[in-house]
């Protein structure tokens, strides 16, 4: 987001869908982004990006390679630093020298933190929401259980489910339920 008043930038991180008044689909940030809201679009231009490999429209495991076959499990493993590097490329392409704010929740918060570490001179402020600098061993274990539940779904087919016109809906549903339990535990544990 370009600061219309002082010439610095701002960036929002989460899914790329920040929405807005002209969008019928409610976005994660609707309560915060807009005219006279916390992130005031009278003052700031908002840049909301899609992560490489995400399900929101970039190249990812379901994209096809040069031979016309889906990458599936052959898509490269990505890390937070990879997403920040692609965002930096976008900033360079847009001519953005400094963000006023890099903000995000959960994985977006981890990216905000990575921006501060990798490019501290490009970031005036960082907003880190519901994110940690390091993933706990419990969280790593629970994430692996979620992945295993999806892999064990009979319709997963080693990640090639679309070739069989299937979708691992049961595994995804169970993994999502487990994920929601972990969110609740964060608020109920001491």
Regions found by a protein language model. Name each.
Residues 28-34, 110, 163-165:
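Short alpha-helical segments and helix-capping/turn motifs at coil-helix boundaries
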Residues 66-68, 123:
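A short alpha->loop->secondary-structure connector
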Residues 72-81:
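Catalytic nucleophile-loop/oxyanion-hole region of alpha/beta-hydrolase
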Residues 81-100:
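Conserved acidic catalytic loop of the alpha/beta-hydrolase fold
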Residues 8, 13-65:
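N-terminal cap/lid subdomain of alpha/beta-hydrolase-fold enzymes
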Residues 128-189:
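Alpha/beta-hydrolase-fold enzymes
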Residues 1-14, 187-190:
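Single conserved hydrophobic/aromatic residue that forms the stacking wall/gate
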